[in-house]
């Protein structure tokens, strides 16, 4: 049965003009796990928690998480339907090219690729931040207050920079030399996230330093912008504006699920398992993440005092708990380990997208970036270039906040683009769908996905993240100029029509190297 499935997957890939170069080693659970790992509610749900809590207090969590989560789920359904039709490593870029044309696909590729690079940067910066605060400070009681440990507005502290660098290098090395181990670790991360999130939620509620749990906190709006929220968000007069901007918590956390698409060529029964892995990763993250972030609010000794902690609110809240020290230490280690595995999966996803764009000659040095190790069946050059770009983007001292918002904005723009193109292509150039077919709900869901995705992208460049907005505008202008100056005539795009037929001999020659 597995052989028939793999032959079918290979046949589908050939029909789109590509050879089976990557090892198809991933099960349906593995495909789910990579997106679930990158979403990692123990990453964004913790490090980005102040975005919402320091905006509108408990309601920003109790109501905001559900609002943002539902929109993310709608986007995942719309993306899943397209992924079922075109299961390639290029993912969004490939879909946009087929449904919206070469230029649309090329622009999508750049937003998606930069978003994925920023994901690695922000996640791995977050890993070090959590390791520093939870393990070194929380477990071993080390003094990590010195400038060398911090990411300042200028050049980051040397210990901070070295720590983030070591984490990124280790992720690249595992992806290069131990892809089988990487897959096992990514699968493990699914269980780790479930176990740690559930344990953390129950422990915080059981050992909350309050006489009784006040559930009204979860729907009580309080304007904590400005100094009241530790300066996380600039002062805002409108509570509605603050609430919408606070959705950045969900935008940053529930993102990166395009990883299921980028590993399509490594997944069994890709047309079925990729869309399922995508929407299930979002759904379970939304549900389990909701209980977890709500427990943060309920377990606080005082909401007003908690908001005043700003970025330190999670460490303050957990330190205030009455849970036994060994349990607290174990949870600290579990949180950091889950975040580390999240970063590992991020490198996998980014390198696959880079490889796919390069094999269509979309990048400088495409020949090298699209090369695949015959022995290991992984795009080795793309792995290390992804890691290098992620590290370089960390050289900006205030990296974490900007990169957190940047990755969310860039990714949601790239999510919206193929879905928007699909609205106009469906029933015209997009006739044959895969097994995951939304039927009559297809266009309504796509329209909601585009609107919701744009809102989630918009919140990412509101103050204090204006720099992200400038990046989006600057990149858009640069890409338009570059397209008309050279890429319009140079870049051929994804294989279509007669080009697919012409590539069949080349595909056969490529696959001979791998003894399939």
PLM features: residue spans?
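Hydrophobic transmembrane alpha-helices that form the core helical bundles
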Residues: 47-51, 63-64, 73-168, 173-176, ...
């Amino acid at each position: 049965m597995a052989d028939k499935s793999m032959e079918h997957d290979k046949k589908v890939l050939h029909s789109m003009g590509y050879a089976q170069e990557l090892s198809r080693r991933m099960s349906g659970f593995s495909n789910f796990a990579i997106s679930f790992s990158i979403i990692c509610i123990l990453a964004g749900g913790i490090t980005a928690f102040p975005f919402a809590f320091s905006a509108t207090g408990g309601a920003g969590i109790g109501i905001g998480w559900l609002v943002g989560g539902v929109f993310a789920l709608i986007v995942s359904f719309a993306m899943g339907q397209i992924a079922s039709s075109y299961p390639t490593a290029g993912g969004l870029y490939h879909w946009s090219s087929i449904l919206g044309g070469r230029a649309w696909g090329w622009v999508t590729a750049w937003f998606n690729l930069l978003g994925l690079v920023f994901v690695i940067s922000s996640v791995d910066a977050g890993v070090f931040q959590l390791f520093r605060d939870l393990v070194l400070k929380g477990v071993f009681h080390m003094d990590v207050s010195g400038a060398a440990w911090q990411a300042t507005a200028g050049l980051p502290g040397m210990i901070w920079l070295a720590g983030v660098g070591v984490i990124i290098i280790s992720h690249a090395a595992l992806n290069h030399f131990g892809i089988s181990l990487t897959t096992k670790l990514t699968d493990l991360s699914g269980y780790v996230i479930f176990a740690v999130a559930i344990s953390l939620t129950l422990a915080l509620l059981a050992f909350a330093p309050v006489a009784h749990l006040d559930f009204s906190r979860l729907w009580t709006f309080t304007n904590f912008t400005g100094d009241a929220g530790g300066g996380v968000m600039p002062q805002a007069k409108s509570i509605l504006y603050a609430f919408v901007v606070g959705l950045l918590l969900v935008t940053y956390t529930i993102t990166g699920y395009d990883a299921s698409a980028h590993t399509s060529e490594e997944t069994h029964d890709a047309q079925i398992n990729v869309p399922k892995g995508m929407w299930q990763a979002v759904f379970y993250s939304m549900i389990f993440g909701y209980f977890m972030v709500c427990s943060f609010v309920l377990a606080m000794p005082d909401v007003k005092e908690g908001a005043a902690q700003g970025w330190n609110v999670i460490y303050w809240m957990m330190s205030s708990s009455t849970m036994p020290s060994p349990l607290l230490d174990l949870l600290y280690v579990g949180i950091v380990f889950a975040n580390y595995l999240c970063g590992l999966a991020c490198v996998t996803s980014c390198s696959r997208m880079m490889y796919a764009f390069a094999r269509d000659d979309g990048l400088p040095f495409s020949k090298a970036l699209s090369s695949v190790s015959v022995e290991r069946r992984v795009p080795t050059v793309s792995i290390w270039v992804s890691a290098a770009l992620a590290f370089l983007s960390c050289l900006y001292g205030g990296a974490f906040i900007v990169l957190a918002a940047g990755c969310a904005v860039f990714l949601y723009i790239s999510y919206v683009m193929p879905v928007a193109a699909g609205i106009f292509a469906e029933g015209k150039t997009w006739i044959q769908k895969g097994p995951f077919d939304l039927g009559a709900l297809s266009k309504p869901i796509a329209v909601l996905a585009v609107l919701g995705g744009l809102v989630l992208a918009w919140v990412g460049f509101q103050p204090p993240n204006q720099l992200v907005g400038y990046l989006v505008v600057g990149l858009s202008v640069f890409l338009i100029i570059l397209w008309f100056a050279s890429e319009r005539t140079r870049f051929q795009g994804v294989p279509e029509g007669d080009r697919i037929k012409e590539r069949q001999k080349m595909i056969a020659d490529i696959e001979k190297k791998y003894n399939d």
